[in-house]
């Protein structure tokens, strides 16, 4: 089977190695598309020359791969994969959409679709996918974070900020974590899918130049006709990798749930109480605790697959 993959390979790292090793495991012939200098310029990438990158790539492949391998120049996003020259393509989650576009082109030209093999991200110890940009910017070396980790929480609530910072410190406490707030507006009293959409919107709007955008939203959802209060967290990083987490949802007491159609849930909590959870538990469980649980859950997938 002929397997293809592509990239710029400006700085060869553990993520590239995972892709190349997978391609060499699957195929008896591997075709590696290497971004041309012109294509790199069009994408705004300041990289070494094609010939220099090709030489480094050839040396690396010789160390890890024992099947026939060809390096070809890529002048567009699709390369030889769109013309029928390959049987399968190895991609990362970041480039999976390109593979789908290639298959659309192939089907349009009556060429059998490629088998798409997705290789998971290889993460640095900050939970963010390793990339040449992060290495060249001096943020990571050998998979280890060497600069402060900047977290931007999409909120004006100090409670949400504290919940996010505590969760990050608990799981990534070996890093220098800096946490700021970015006020983000979402619809009041979200319910159902609005809770998830609101969390994602907060994460996207807060990211900016930070390493993580954190979106936390809470609202009423229904499970089998039962009104529940759920806290949701969306974590979006500077590489575009999005992960999710929720805190345990709990049932809203029936006498309160009956009033939800015309009364915001916050107005059902007696004055002076921190939250519905705190009111029901007599302070044993707080809103901050539940939000921290949601952020912690969203971080868990990022602890797997670290270099």
Residue locations for each model-derived region?
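Anionic-ligand binding patches
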Residues: 189-307
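Nucleotidyltransferase catalytic core that binds NTPs
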Residues: 1-151, 160, 170-176, 185-189, ...
């Amino acid at each position: 089977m002929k397997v293809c993959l592509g990239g710029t390979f400006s700085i060869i790292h553990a993520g590239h190695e995972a892709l190349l090793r997978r391609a060499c495991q699957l195929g008896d012939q591997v075709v590696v598309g290497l971004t041309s200098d012109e294509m790199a310029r069009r994408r705004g990438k300041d990289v070494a020359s094609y010939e220099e990158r090709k030489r480094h790539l050839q040396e690396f492949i010789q160390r890890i791969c024992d099947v026939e391998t060809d390096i070809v120049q890529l002048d567009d996003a699709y390369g030889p994969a769109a013309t029928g020259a390959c049987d399968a393509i190895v991609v990362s989650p970041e480039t999976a959409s390109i593979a789908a576009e290639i298959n659309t082109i192939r089907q349009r030209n009556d060429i059998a679709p490629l088998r798409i093999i997705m290789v998971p991200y290889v993460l640095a110890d900050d939970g963010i996918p390793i990339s040449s940009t992060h290495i060249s910017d001096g943020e990571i070396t050998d998979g280890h974070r060497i600069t402060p980790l900047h977290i931007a929480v999409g909120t004006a609530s100090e409670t949400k900020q504290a919940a996010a910072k505590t969760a990050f410190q608990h799981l990534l406490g070996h890093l220098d974590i800096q946490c700021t707030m970015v006020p983000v507006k979402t619809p009041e009293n979200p319910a159902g899918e609005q809770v998830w959409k609101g969390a994602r919107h907060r994460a996207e709007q807060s990211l900016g130049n930070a390493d993580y955008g954190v979106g936390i939203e809470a609202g009423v959802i229904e499970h089998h006709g039962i009104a529940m209060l759920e806290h949701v967290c969306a974590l979006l990083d500077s590489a575009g990798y999005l992960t999710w987490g929720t805190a345990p949802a709990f049932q809203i007491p029936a006498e309160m749930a009956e009033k939800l159609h015309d009364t915001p849930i916050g107005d059902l909590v007696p004055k002076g109480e921190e939250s519905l959870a705190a009111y029901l538990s007599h302070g044993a469980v707080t809103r901050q605790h539940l939000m921290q649980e949601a952020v912690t859950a969203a971080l868990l997938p990022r602890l797997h697959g670290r270099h």
